[in-house]
């Protein structure tokens, strides 16, 4: 009940509206990363209060490691859901000393999962991606964010490697292309610096090695029909092409500025 009462306070006072903001870079919608951030704050605040309440009024029921264990043992999909409670509560606990201070974390919320993971105010880097689609259509674009990246890498890598590889995330744009019944993506990842880019690329090679087989310049998924190709667009930007093999083999990336890129797909 303490947990749900916090949600009542959040909505009655309009705190949730301060956290929910759109991303013009993803066509005026809320990005996947910003949506995760929203739930990390809302559920993290409620879980923080719940933990405080249990510790004070029902100490025999307290199990501070329960969420951590659940998160560690979960599937990737489950981790994305449990993170809002586990990692969100950790973030709120670092931001406030008391439940009485919760309004502050809502009125001045984080703008990315990166800020939640590191309790930082690092801004999202500038990244612009244009497309020349040929006979393909640019169907959707989104910002996935550091938390999504970390959890995705964790499916094939150990925790420390996945965390280190995702650290240094500056911005990303995942663009989905479609042609008839075929789909593919270009995932442009911009890093804080060249060292972070290099670390990610090395880890991603190991990630691919665990789930796919190298075939020339591409990787072919062992238990599916997905194809992957990794391109170093600049020393601070990595592009991962994935999905339909024809798309992955033919797509190119052109650098028009250090943070501006054009994805071109052959007809």
Q: Where would I find each of the regions flagged by the language model?
A:
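C-terminal soluble interaction/assembly domains
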Residues: 181-267
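Pan-zinc metallopeptidase signature
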Residues: 75-188
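Short alpha-helix carrying the canonical HExxH Zn2+-binding catalytic motif
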Residues: 1-9
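Extracytoplasmic/secreted proteins, especially bacterial periplasmic and envelope-associated proteins
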Residues: 4, 37, 41-52, 83, ...
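Second-shell loop/turn segments in exported
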Residues: 1, 28-39, 75-82, 185-192
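Alpha/beta-hydrolase
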Residues: 50, 54, 61-74, 81-84, ...
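Post-HExxH zinc-binding segment in Zn-dependent metallohydrolases
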Residues: 13-63
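Long, terminal "pre-/pro-" and other extracytoplasmic accessory regions
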Residues: 6, 15-29, 33, 37, ...
